Amino acid sequence: VYLYQTAPGWSEFKRISAYRNLVIRPSVATAINTSVTRDLVLNADDKWVVESAPEWVTLDKTSGTGKTEIKLTFSQMSAGAGMREGEVVFKLVDKDYRTRCKVTQYDYEYAEDQILTLQSASKGDGVNLVFLGDGYNAKDISEGKLLTNINEAVEHFFNIEPYKTYREYFNVYTGIAVSPESGVGGVNTIIHNRFNTTSKGDVSLGGRNGESDFNMIFEYACKAPTVSNSNLDETLVVMIPNTEDYGGICYMWDGGAAIAYCPMSNYGYPMDFRGVIQHEAGGHGFAKLGDEYIYHNAFIDNCDCTCCGHVFEFNLAKAKGWYENLSLTGKMNEVPWSH
């Protein structure tokens, strides 16, 4: 350090000190009233210790050496207590070097992971819809953003036929899923959210880890009172990522289960939030309809692109009873909707 401090050109820097590796990730941890545990990772190049922390959080490790996984637990907070915040300060032993994790707990009327019944079927046996949000941190949720967006999505779903007429046949649920961070990441940006939702391309959302994330979503949906593994194939899950980017997509499984990712697009209709809900959730996820377009000027039986469905995919979907809005015939009296 002394050599740098005395070297020509370096004396202009106000502070020159030895590099120390001490980083906590994430550097922010949030929660609502519920007692809950968050995972942290501390990177250090030497012995470290927790110098201070608010009394309402506990850590399973308060000292160590090198890289360490730490569990930080928020204590239960009484309803109506208001927000509380503080810092957990980590320090390298025998060195004046620190890093901090900001902790905040927000007051909210519902508990983390509490399942809410938005609507119960008053006719029939009840068809299950589960609307979930991803990328909503404790602050977003305490400000009402999650439930506002979920309720808007539900109304968009039932604002078009035939769902408008048959609304009384549906059970509708949501859950208070808190994400460590707010938003949705992409190819070059990782945002840690509850269900690992990320943007995978121009118009593609999904779980960062693929099938394991989808299984986690289905497991969460089964927390709803009338949803179980036995009827997941008859249940539609609608995921509302906390982003305004356009990128709706619906993942459908052979048995009938589906997860429709419907971001809050701010484009004009039909590419806005309402249109995405009606297309992905109502059209694909529930009705199992196929897209009535391709991405370029070509016939599907001669096209060899990888971006559009072709005859094989079409026939495969037809064999499952899907795509009743599509036909390969040019004869009007032979199409499924001919009357």
What are these regions (language model features)?
Residues 82-94:
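A short beta-strand micro-motif common to beta-rich folds, especially ectodomain repeats
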